[in-house]
Amino acid sequence: MIYYVIALFVIAIDQISKWLIVKNMELGTSIPIIDNVLYITSHRNRGAAWGILENKMWFFYIITVVFVVFIVFYMKKYAKTDKLLGISLGLILGGAMGNFIDRVFRQEVVDFIHVYIFSYNYPVFNIADSALCIGVVLIIIQTLLEGKKAKE
């Protein structure tokens, strides 16, 4: 299915970008892309966003495996007839696997996208995180649109 190709594409872009950061930037260094808005910053994370559950790798391993099995099952069952759901789940699967690969092989996640939103210093993130968030937002939008159609 094309949705697995989307997941593989996310994994590839995520892992290549992280490899480039690890090979070419010292930990903690930043490259400004748009001053006061967007930076490429070499950062490592041993937990989730905002340092939640730091150094609890076993927890992330278990949760990710269960989550990936659920996503694959859900894709097989429901994505055949629903393109947007399939695309969303492909993005989520790719994002989950991208960070899982880091946790297994590096015991930490490589983050590098650093943004300031209205002067708020948002936690540094990566391509996998972005794919996960975009996938979730697409599912929320789809759910809201379907709810609106059902009311009409």
Curated annotation (Swiss-Prot):
PANTHER family: LIPOPROTEIN SIGNAL PEPTIDASE (PTHR33695:SF1). GO terms for biological process: proteolysis. One of its GO terms (cellular component) is plasma membrane. This is Lipoprotein signal peptidase. Pathway: Protein modification; lipoprotein biosynthesis (signal peptide cleavage). The chain crosses the membrane at residues 55-75, 85-105, 124-144. The active site is at D111, D129. Keywords: Aspartyl protease, Cell membrane, Hydrolase, Membrane, Protease, Transmembrane, Transmembrane helix. This protein specifically catalyzes the removal of signal peptides from prolipoproteins. It catalyses: Release of signal peptides from bacterial membrane prolipoproteins. Hydrolyzes -Xaa-Yaa-Zaa-|-(S,diacylglyceryl)Cys-, in which Xaa is hydrophobic (preferably Leu), and Yaa (Ala or Ser) and Zaa (Gly or Ala) have small, neutral side chains. The gene is lspA. InterPro entries: Peptidase_A8 (IPR001872). Belongs to the peptidase A8 family. It is a multi-pass membrane protein. Pfam families: Peptidase_A8. It is found in: Cell membrane. It comes from Bacillus cereus (strain B4264). GO terms for molecular function: aspartic-type endopeptidase activity. Its EC number is 3.4.23.36.
